[in-house]
């Protein structure tokens, strides 16, 4: 059995759906929201690499590496902001984020 493009697209669609459900079903926890966004970005990367391989083009794979780099930076900055917010407020609830106004 050969793993074809449809298998990669199915896995990507499942990951994307899980990410969207994670955002909509759990709006109270910032960490779960960040993890759901990372799942969505991973699904996009799988699509990029699958179509790049299917079309014999390297541009999609290079762009997927760029997206991974930006996603890693986004996760690091988001978690750093979350740690500072927890130290100041003692909670990471989404409802308390509106208190961050300057």
From Swiss-Prot:
- InterPro entries associated with the record: NADH_UbQ_OxRdtase_chain4L/K, NUOK/Mnh_C1-like
Gene3D superfamilies of this UniProt entry? Answer: 1.10.287.3510
Location(s) in or outside the cell:
Cell inner membrane
E.C. code = 7.1.1.-
The record's listing under Pfam families reads: Oxidored_q2 (PF00420)
| Chief location bin | membrane
List the GO biological process terms.
ATP synthesis coupled electron transport
Q: Name one GO cellular component term.
A: plasma membrane
Which EC main class describes this enzyme?
translocase
- Quote the catalytic activity from the record: a quinone + NADH + 5 H(+)(in) = a quinol + NAD(+) + 4 H(+)(out)
Domain of life (superkingdom): Bacteria
Q: Which UniProt keywords apply?
A: Cell inner membrane, Cell membrane, Membrane, NAD, Quinone, Translocase, Transmembrane, Transmembrane helix, Transport, Ubiquinone
Transmembrane stretches, start-end: 5-25, 31-51, 65-85
User: How the protein assembles, per its UniProt entry?
Assistant: NDH-1 is composed of 14 different subunits. Subunits NuoA, H, J, K, L, M, N constitute the membrane sector of the complex.
State the family named in the UniProt similarity comment for this chain.
Belongs to the complex I subunit 4L family.
PANTHER family on file: NADH DEHYDROGENASE SUBUNIT 4L-RELATED (PTHR11434:SF21), NADH-UBIQUINONE OXIDOREDUCTASE SUBUNIT ND4L (PTHR11434)
Function noted in UniProt: NDH-1 shuttles electrons from NADH, via FMN and iron-sulfur (Fe-S) centers, to quinones in the respiratory chain. The immediate electron acceptor for the enzyme in this species is believed to be ubiquinone. Couples the redox reaction to proton translocation (for every two electrons transferred, four hydrogen ions are translocated across the cytoplasmic membrane), and thus conserves the redox energy in a proton gradient.
Q: What is this protein called?
A: NADH-quinone oxidoreductase subunit K
Originating organism: Rhizobium leguminosarum bv. trifolii (strain WSM2304)
Higher taxonomy: Bacteria, Pseudomonadati, Pseudomonadota, Alphaproteobacteria, Hyphomicrobiales
Gene of this entry: nuoK
């Amino acid at each position: 059995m050969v793993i074809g493009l449809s298998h990669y697209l199915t896995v990507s669609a499942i990951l994307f759906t899980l990410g969207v459900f994670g955002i909509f079903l759990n709006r109270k926890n910032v960490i779960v929201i960040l993890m759901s966004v990372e799942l969505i970005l991973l699904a996009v990367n799988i699509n990029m690499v699958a179509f790049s391989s299917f079309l014999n083009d390297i541009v999609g794979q290079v762009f997927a590496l760029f997206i991974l780099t930006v996603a890693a930076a986004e996760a690091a900055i988001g978690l750093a902001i979350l740690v500072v917010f927890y130290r100041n407020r003692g909670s990471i609830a989404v409802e308390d984020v509106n208190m961050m106004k300057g």
